[in-house]
Amino acid sequence: MIPLCAPSTPAIIAPRPRRLRHRTTTPSPPHSRSPHHRGHLHLASSSSSTHRPRPLARAQRPGAVVTAADMVFSVTKRDTTPYEGQKPGTSGLRKKVTVFQQPHYLANFVQSTFNALPADQVKGATIVVSGDGRYFSKDAVQIIAKMAAANGVRRVWVGQDSLLSTPAVSAIIRERISADGAKATGAFILTASHNPGGPTEDFGIKYNMENGGPAPESVTDKIFSNTKTITEYLIAEDLPDVDISVTGVTSFTGPEGPFDVDVFDSATDYIKLIKTIFDFESIKKLLASPKFSFCFDGLHGVAGAYAKRIFVDELGASESSLLNCVPKEDFGGGHPDPNLTYAKELVDRMGLGKTSNGEPPEFGAAADGDADRNMVLGKRFFVTPSDSVAIIAANAVQSIPYFASGLKGVARSMPTSAALDVVAKNLNLKFFEVPTGWKFFGNLMDAGMCSVCGEESFGTGSDHIREKDGIWAVLAWLSILAYKNKDNLGGDKLVTVEDIVLQHWGTYGRHYYTRYDYENVDAEAAKELMANLVKMQASLPDVNKSIKEIQPAVADVVSADEFEYKDPVDGSVSKHQGIRYLFGDGSRLVFRLSGTGSVGATIRIYIEQYEKDSSKTGRESSDALSPLVDVALKLSKIQEYTGRSAPTVIT
C-alpha cells in the first residue's frame, strides 16, 4: 500500500524586509518585458482545484505593469515520506490523476527533481512550467510555482492557461530570452502525452534540460533515487495563486530576493521559430489551390492552441479544415492518440473509415495531446510513421529551406522500420539506431550528428528543437507536397500523398509494417513472456525449426539479441531495450515492454517484412505481413502468457 503522509509541523523561513515602490510603466513586447511587473489580488479558483482556493495574483489587463509593495512570501519546510513507484519512464512520470492528488505526491517528485539538478539550474534560474492542459494541470502549475519560489528559482515562465505543447516548451527553453538576458535552464512539462485525460484518467510530469530535451537517464535515475529517500520539501505556501489566464508578469519577494511568474502567449515563440524553417509562401500557394484540400485534427489537445494561428491565420487554410482544435481538460472524452483507432473522425473524413461519406481531402493530419506526435494521411491512404520519417529525410534538402545545405545525419528508434536505413545508405548519410525515447536523439543532435529522426510511435522531428514535433511533421509534408506541385498548381491533377509514397517505394523498396499492442496486461506475465523470448535466442537452429513448423515460407532468423545501445557521444550504455529477431531477407520481429502506460504493462510486437521488388510493393499490408504475424504470435506464446486472444490496438 502506498503510504499517506501525516500532517507535519512546518519550519518557516521568513523573507528579508524589503520595501517596494508603487509604480506603473508602459507595457512592453513579450520578449522585452520588464521583469518587475506587479499584480493585484482578487478571489478565484481553479476549474480543477483540489486544494483550498487562494487569492489570485494577476496583472489587471494583458501586458499591464503594476507594482505592489506587499506581495511577499516565506518558505516552509514540509516533512514528508516517500511514495513507491515514482520512477520516470521514457517520457516522465505518468499515473492516474487520483494518484497525483494524494498528499505530497506531486511535491515529492518536484522536490526530488530540484535536488537532482545542479545548483545553478535551480538557484537564480528561470524554468518553464506548462503542458497540454489536461485535468489537474492548473493546480500543478500553482504547486510547482510555489515550490520553485521556495527553492530559490528566480522566475517561472508559464504559457497562458497553462498551455504549451511539448515542442513549444523545447523551443522556448532554447530560444526565449528575458529582459535581463536570462534563458530558461529547464522545464516541468505537465503531460501524459497521448494518454486520456480527466478526473479518473492520466496525468504526467517530466523534466526537460537546458538543451530543450528530456532529462537523460543520469538525471532521471537520480530523481528516482531521491524519491525513495525524500524526507522534506520546500514550498512557499503563502504565495498567492497567479492568474494564468492573463498574460503579464507578477512579482513577489522572498527570503532570497525577487521571484517572478511570467504568463505569456502560448504560440508566439513557437511560430516565430517554425517560420524560419519552412517556406510559408510556397505552402500558402498549395493551400490556395482549388485542387488541394486539407484537414487537421487536434484531438482536443494543446495543438489546438497552435492550429488556427498557423494553418488558418498564417497559411490561409479554411477554419472548417480544423477538427477538434479547442483544447479540453479531458480531450473531449476521447483518447488523444493520433492513430487509425483513436483519430476516428479524421480517419472517416479521409475516406479510411467504415462510415466515410463524401469526397475526402487531399491531405489530413492529427496531433496527440501534447502535440509532439503526428499522423499523416492522404486521400484514402495511410502513411506509416516509419515511412513518413524516411520520406521526409529523402526529400528534406529540396523541400525545406532549413535543410538546404544538407543533412548531418538521420536516426530512428530501434523498433521503427528500416525504411530510414535504406534512405541513409542510398544518400550516403550518417545513420543511427537508438533505444525508444527522444532523449537519445538529443545527444546526437547536440553533437551535430543528426538532423532528422523518428519513431514508429508517430513521433517525427529534427534538430530545430530537442523533442519530436507533430506540427513540424505536418508542415514538412505540406512542404514536400508544395515542392512536388510547384509547377503544377494550375494543372489537372496534383501530385498526391499516395503518389509520393508509391514513388518512394519504387526507389527504396517497401517495409510492410505493423504494431500489435497488448495494453494493461499482468506485469509478471509480461516479464515471463519476455524472459522466454530471450532464453530462446540461445539456439537459433531451434528457433528456425519452430518457425518452419509455423510458416515454412518465412526466411530464417540470422541474428537475435536483446538490443543494447552505447551512446557514441557520451559513451553511456542502455541495456534491455527490446528483443530482436532479424531475418535473412531484411525482415524483423521486435518485442518490447513499453514504459509509457500508467497501469499494468504494455507488450508491443513490431512486425516488419521488407520487399525490394517494386512489382510487389503494392500488396495489402495485412496480406504481406500475415505469415510473420502468425510467427510472432505463436513464437511468443502471447495468448498463453497473457490470456489475450487479440491485441488492444493494431497500428
Segments from the language model and where they lie:
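Phosphate-binding and adjacent anionic-ligand microenvironments
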Residues: P361-F363, A367, V376-K379, S399-R604, ...
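Proline/glycine-rich low-complexity loops and linkers
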Residues: G159-L163, E217-A267, G378-G461
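Buried hydrophobic positions in well-ordered alpha/beta secondary-structure cores of metabolic enzymes
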Residues: S91, V129, V169, F188, ...
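Conserved phosphate/anionic-ligand binding catalytic regions in large, soluble enzymes, centered on
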Residues: Y83-V99, S193-N195, G298-V302, Y306, ...
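N-terminal small/polar loop signature for handling phosphorylated ligands or for N-terminal nucleophile
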Residues: N115, K123-E201, A267, R309-V376
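An N-terminal, well-structured beta->alpha segment
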Residues: P55-A150, E175, D180, E256-F294, ...
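Gly/Ser/Thr-enriched, mixed-charge loops and adjacent short helices
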Residues: S74-Y83, D180, P199-G358
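N-terminal chloroplast transit peptides
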Residues: M1-S48
